[in-house]
Amino acid sequence: TEKALGKNKSGITGTKNCDLFFSKKNERGAWQKPEPIEGDVNTEDDEGVISFSPDGTTMYLTKARREPNADTSVEIYTSTRTGAQWSAPQKYEITADTLSAFGHPAVSPDGEFLYFVSDMPGGYGGKDIWRISLTEKEGTLENLGVQINTPGDEMFPYIRSNGDLYFSSDGHPGMGGLDIFKAKMNDSGFWQIENMKAPINSQADDFGITFGEEESGFFSSNRGDGRGYDNIYSFELPSISVWISGTVIDKDDEPVPDAIIRIVGNDGSNQKEFARKDGS
């Protein structure tokens, strides 16, 4: 934030207007100094919360909208990548509504839908999560419904390749402030919603979760910061390795060579193995 282009304070955060930055890891695995994103994306206004098309050539971003004698609101813009540069953002028209806020874009992994947050009419109160088709658009605007949205605020959606939806909410039962939730659709078409609990969630605001490889990723939180500033955290759920050994014997305590062994997990998994010649 301190290195952002704008000189004014954000009407949303109260700090200096935000720009978009990127950072890479060096050969030792340490994060390098953040650099402003290349091109003409950053301006005097607030830029934040981005998502990319599956091919990485289109960026969807949240951008502040300022009008005289009105509260600061946000809109969704797009930028396209040509070579190493991002183009100047262009407003992405979702509806003709010029009064409501539109932000927190999240492109589905297949590139079919754009999920976003809005307080437009037709919701369930506060800010709701909506989606619209990126390929058809006309007539595809859809509120995610009462199972996801509450009279409170639902924000920062993120879609994984398996269809699971992650979002932050202060309307679902949580630990305090904004909590991160996981929503999985069952075979009947209903969302099953799960609070991510500690250590992902805290009594502060926890939001903006994204995933990288397997069960690792990043999220933001203002926990433990007396100034209320947001910090980026990383997380990883390590895989669990279980070593099982034994010997297959018959009623006479003799080893059974080439015996078929079934390992059944409580998640329904069923693995077939064969014993050695000595029954082990």
Regions found by a protein language model. Give the residues of each.
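Short, conserved micro-motifs composed of acidic
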Residues: T1-T247, K251-I260, K272-D278
